[in-house]
Regions:
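Short, low-complexity, polar/charged sequence segments that are solvent-exposed and flexible
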Residues: 34-37, 75-78, 199-200, 207-211
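Charge-rich, low-complexity amphipathic helices
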Residues: 28-30, 38, 78-82, 86, ...
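C-terminal, charged low-complexity interaction regions
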Residues: 121-240
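An N-terminal structural lobe/cap that precedes and organizes the functional/catalytic core
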Residues: 1-69
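Generic structural hydrophobic/aromatic packing signal, biased to beta-strands
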Residues: 3, 20, 103, 179-181, ...
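Catalytic cores of phosphodiester-bond-cleaving enzymes
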Residues: 45-118
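Short N-terminal signal/transit or membrane-insertion segments
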Residues: 1, 21, 30, 110-126, ...
Length: 240
Protein backbone atom coordinates (compact mmCIF):
# COMPACT_ATOMS: atom_id res chain seq x y z
CA UNK A 1 0.00 0.00 0.00
CA UNK A 2 1.07 3.59 -0.63
CA UNK A 3 0.97 6.48 1.83
CA UNK A 4 -2.69 7.44 2.05
CA UNK A 5 -1.73 11.12 2.23
CA UNK A 6 0.18 10.97 -1.07
CA UNK A 7 -2.39 13.29 -2.65
CA UNK A 8 -0.59 16.17 -0.91
CA UNK A 9 2.47 15.55 -3.08
CA UNK A 10 5.03 15.98 -0.29
CA UNK A 11 5.75 12.43 0.90
CA UNK A 12 9.25 11.86 2.29
CA UNK A 13 11.26 9.25 4.17
CA UNK A 14 9.65 6.18 2.64
CA UNK A 15 6.82 4.15 4.13
CA UNK A 16 6.92 3.83 7.92
CA UNK A 17 5.24 1.46 10.34
CA UNK A 18 2.18 3.37 11.58
CA UNK A 19 0.11 2.21 14.54
CA UNK A 20 -3.34 2.22 12.98
CA UNK A 21 -4.62 2.90 16.49
CA UNK A 22 -2.31 5.15 18.52
CA UNK A 23 -0.22 3.09 20.93
CA UNK A 24 -0.32 5.89 23.52
CA UNK A 25 -3.95 5.18 24.47
CA UNK A 26 -3.07 1.71 25.77
CA UNK A 27 -1.63 0.84 29.17
CA UNK A 28 0.08 -2.49 28.52
CA UNK A 29 2.35 -4.15 25.99
CA UNK A 30 -0.36 -6.35 24.48
CA UNK A 31 -3.80 -5.72 23.01
CA UNK A 32 -6.70 -7.85 21.84
CA UNK A 33 -7.57 -7.37 18.17
CA UNK A 34 -10.80 -8.44 16.50
CA UNK A 35 -12.63 -7.68 13.27
CA UNK A 36 -9.62 -7.02 11.06
CA UNK A 37 -8.88 -9.16 8.02
CA UNK A 38 -6.42 -11.38 9.89
CA UNK A 39 -8.59 -11.78 13.01
CA UNK A 40 -12.13 -11.61 11.64
CA UNK A 41 -13.38 -14.83 13.23
CA UNK A 42 -12.22 -14.52 16.84
CA UNK A 43 -10.19 -12.16 19.07
CA UNK A 44 -6.42 -12.52 19.02
CA UNK A 45 -3.97 -11.10 21.53
CA UNK A 46 -0.96 -9.46 19.89
CA UNK A 47 1.89 -7.27 21.06
CA UNK A 48 1.27 -3.56 20.78
CA UNK A 49 4.37 -3.29 18.60
CA UNK A 50 2.71 -5.61 16.06
CA UNK A 51 -0.38 -3.43 15.60
CA UNK A 52 1.18 -1.51 12.73
CA UNK A 53 0.91 -1.25 8.97
CA UNK A 54 2.86 0.56 6.26
CA UNK A 55 0.15 3.04 5.31
CA UNK A 56 1.90 6.40 5.77
CA UNK A 57 5.26 7.82 4.80
CA UNK A 58 7.66 8.86 7.55
CA UNK A 59 6.93 12.59 7.11
CA UNK A 60 3.15 12.28 7.35
CA UNK A 61 3.32 9.75 10.17
CA UNK A 62 5.47 12.07 12.28
CA UNK A 63 3.13 15.02 11.72
CA UNK A 64 0.40 13.14 13.57
CA UNK A 65 2.38 13.13 16.83
CA UNK A 66 0.53 16.11 18.43
CA UNK A 67 -2.85 14.48 17.71
CA UNK A 68 -1.73 11.12 19.10
CA UNK A 69 -0.41 12.85 22.22
CA UNK A 70 -3.77 14.55 22.83
CA UNK A 71 -5.63 11.23 22.64
CA UNK A 72 -3.07 9.67 24.99
CA UNK A 73 -3.69 12.46 27.53
CA UNK A 74 -7.41 11.74 27.47
CA UNK A 75 -6.86 8.00 27.81
CA UNK A 76 -4.53 8.42 30.79
CA UNK A 77 -6.91 10.91 32.44
CA UNK A 78 -9.82 8.48 32.20
CA UNK A 79 -7.80 5.52 33.46
CA UNK A 80 -6.34 7.45 36.39
CA UNK A 81 -9.56 9.15 37.50
CA UNK A 82 -12.34 6.72 36.64
CA UNK A 83 -10.55 3.45 37.34
CA UNK A 84 -7.82 4.28 39.88
CA UNK A 85 -9.32 7.22 41.82
CA UNK A 86 -13.07 7.36 41.21
CA UNK A 87 -13.98 9.28 44.39
CA UNK A 88 -11.99 12.44 43.67
CA UNK A 89 -13.05 15.25 41.37
CA UNK A 90 -10.76 15.86 38.42
CA UNK A 91 -10.53 18.05 35.34
CA UNK A 92 -8.42 18.13 32.20
CA UNK A 93 -8.24 20.67 29.39
CA UNK A 94 -7.50 19.39 25.89
CA UNK A 95 -7.27 20.91 22.44
CA UNK A 96 -10.45 19.95 20.66
CA UNK A 97 -9.16 20.14 17.11
CA UNK A 98 -6.22 17.89 17.94
CA UNK A 99 -8.51 15.28 19.44
CA UNK A 100 -10.85 15.60 16.45
CA UNK A 101 -8.00 15.15 13.99
CA UNK A 102 -6.76 12.12 15.92
CA UNK A 103 -10.24 10.58 15.62
CA UNK A 104 -10.43 11.39 11.92
CA UNK A 105 -6.92 10.01 11.34
CA UNK A 106 -7.87 6.79 13.13
CA UNK A 107 -11.01 6.55 10.98
CA UNK A 108 -8.94 6.93 7.80
CA UNK A 109 -6.31 4.46 9.03
CA UNK A 110 -8.93 1.81 9.75
CA UNK A 111 -10.70 2.45 6.48
CA UNK A 112 -7.46 2.17 4.52
CA UNK A 113 -6.63 -1.26 5.97
CA UNK A 114 -10.20 -2.55 5.60
CA UNK A 115 -10.94 -2.34 9.32
CA UNK A 116 -14.29 -0.58 8.85
CA UNK A 117 -15.72 -3.43 6.77
CA UNK A 118 -15.52 -6.58 8.95
CA UNK A 119 -17.38 -8.71 6.40
CA UNK A 120 -15.56 -7.98 3.14
CA UNK A 121 -12.61 -5.86 4.37
CA UNK A 122 -12.98 -3.46 1.47
CA UNK A 123 -10.43 -0.68 1.73
CA UNK A 124 -11.54 2.93 1.91
CA UNK A 125 -9.53 5.52 -0.03
CA UNK A 126 -9.31 8.74 2.01
CA UNK A 127 -11.05 11.73 0.46
CA UNK A 128 -8.73 14.55 -0.52
CA UNK A 129 -10.66 17.18 1.45
CA UNK A 130 -10.30 15.13 4.65
CA UNK A 131 -6.59 14.60 4.07
CA UNK A 132 -6.06 18.33 3.53
CA UNK A 133 -8.01 19.15 6.69
CA UNK A 134 -5.70 16.89 8.69
CA UNK A 135 -2.42 18.24 7.35
CA UNK A 136 -3.14 21.79 6.22
CA UNK A 137 -4.75 24.89 7.73
CA UNK A 138 -8.03 24.31 5.93
CA UNK A 139 -11.41 24.34 7.66
CA UNK A 140 -13.65 21.30 7.56
CA UNK A 141 -17.28 22.00 6.59
CA UNK A 142 -19.60 22.15 9.60
CA UNK A 143 -20.78 18.71 10.62
CA UNK A 144 -17.55 16.92 9.76
CA UNK A 145 -15.59 15.98 12.85
CA UNK A 146 -16.06 14.92 16.46
CA UNK A 147 -19.29 14.27 18.38
CA UNK A 148 -19.71 13.22 22.02
CA UNK A 149 -22.40 10.67 22.90
CA UNK A 150 -23.76 10.60 26.45
CA UNK A 151 -23.91 7.37 28.42
CA UNK A 152 -22.88 5.64 31.63
CA UNK A 153 -19.23 5.05 32.56
CA UNK A 154 -18.47 2.61 35.38
CA UNK A 155 -15.20 1.93 37.16
CA UNK A 156 -16.50 -1.56 37.95
CA UNK A 157 -16.57 -2.53 34.26
CA UNK A 158 -13.97 -0.11 32.93
CA UNK A 159 -12.17 -1.08 29.73
CA UNK A 160 -8.98 0.53 28.48
CA UNK A 161 -8.80 0.64 24.71
CA UNK A 162 -10.71 1.47 21.57
CA UNK A 163 -13.66 -0.21 19.87
CA UNK A 164 -15.50 1.02 16.78
CA UNK A 165 -18.29 0.46 14.28
CA UNK A 166 -18.64 1.97 10.84
CA UNK A 167 -21.58 4.26 10.09
CA UNK A 168 -23.10 3.71 6.64
CA UNK A 169 -25.24 6.14 4.68
CA UNK A 170 -28.03 3.97 3.28
CA UNK A 171 -29.17 6.77 0.97
CA UNK A 172 -25.75 6.60 -0.72
CA UNK A 173 -25.63 2.85 -1.36
CA UNK A 174 -24.26 2.14 2.09
CA UNK A 175 -21.16 4.29 1.71
CA UNK A 176 -19.17 4.62 4.93
CA UNK A 177 -19.90 8.05 6.38
CA UNK A 178 -18.06 7.88 9.70
CA UNK A 179 -17.68 5.67 12.74
CA UNK A 180 -18.85 5.36 16.29
CA UNK A 181 -16.03 4.67 18.73
CA UNK A 182 -15.56 4.11 22.43
CA UNK A 183 -12.32 5.27 24.06
CA UNK A 184 -11.93 3.94 27.59
CA UNK A 185 -15.73 3.56 27.88
CA UNK A 186 -16.48 7.15 26.74
CA UNK A 187 -18.49 7.24 23.53
CA UNK A 188 -17.82 9.40 20.50
CA UNK A 189 -18.62 9.63 16.80
CA UNK A 190 -16.42 10.95 14.02
CA UNK A 191 -18.39 12.01 10.95
CA UNK A 192 -16.97 12.42 7.45
CA UNK A 193 -20.14 13.98 6.04
CA UNK A 194 -21.19 17.62 5.94
CA UNK A 195 -24.21 18.89 7.82
CA UNK A 196 -25.51 18.28 11.34
CA UNK A 197 -25.32 14.57 12.11
CA UNK A 198 -27.26 14.45 15.39
CA UNK A 199 -30.58 13.39 13.83
CA UNK A 200 -28.91 10.92 11.47
CA UNK A 201 -27.02 9.36 14.37
CA UNK A 202 -30.20 9.01 16.43
CA UNK A 203 -31.56 6.75 13.69
CA UNK A 204 -28.76 4.25 14.26
CA UNK A 205 -30.66 2.85 17.25
CA UNK A 206 -29.00 0.28 19.49
CA UNK A 207 -25.36 -0.55 18.72
CA UNK A 208 -23.19 -2.57 21.12
CA UNK A 209 -25.37 -1.66 24.08
CA UNK A 210 -25.55 2.06 23.25
CA UNK A 211 -28.99 3.42 22.30
CA UNK A 212 -28.24 6.33 19.99
CA UNK A 213 -31.94 7.16 19.73
CA UNK A 214 -32.01 8.10 23.42
CA UNK A 215 -28.52 9.44 23.96
CA UNK A 216 -27.73 13.13 23.72
CA UNK A 217 -25.24 13.86 20.96
CA UNK A 218 -23.08 17.01 20.89
CA UNK A 219 -20.96 18.32 18.02
CA UNK A 220 -17.55 19.64 19.08
CA UNK A 221 -18.49 19.86 22.77
CA UNK A 222 -16.75 22.39 24.98
CA UNK A 223 -17.27 20.42 28.19
CA UNK A 224 -17.83 16.73 28.86
CA UNK A 225 -18.91 16.02 32.44
CA UNK A 226 -18.95 12.49 33.82
CA UNK A 227 -21.40 12.71 36.73
CA UNK A 228 -22.01 10.25 39.54
CA UNK A 229 -23.97 10.08 42.79
CA UNK A 230 -21.22 7.98 44.38
CA UNK A 231 -18.03 9.31 42.76
CA UNK A 232 -16.37 12.63 42.03
CA UNK A 233 -17.22 14.55 38.87
CA UNK A 234 -14.74 14.19 36.02
CA UNK A 235 -14.67 17.10 33.58
CA UNK A 236 -13.07 17.17 30.15
CA UNK A 237 -12.79 20.72 28.81
CA UNK A 238 -12.16 21.00 25.07
CA UNK A 239 -10.73 24.18 23.59
CA UNK A 240 -11.76 24.82 19.98
Amino acid sequence: MDCWAAVLGDCAGGLSREHYISDGIFDGEAITAYGLEWCKDHPIQISLASAVSKILCKRHNERFSPFDAEAAKLSRFLSANVLDDPLSEAQITLRGYRLEKWALKTFLNLGYIGGLDPEHHARLKPREDLVRYLFQETQAPKGIGLYFVTGAVSNAKFNVGLSWNAIRNLSRDGAIAGMTFTLNDVRFVVSAEEGPAEHRLAKIGLVNGVDYSRAKIYYRPHNIALLSKTAGQKTIALEW
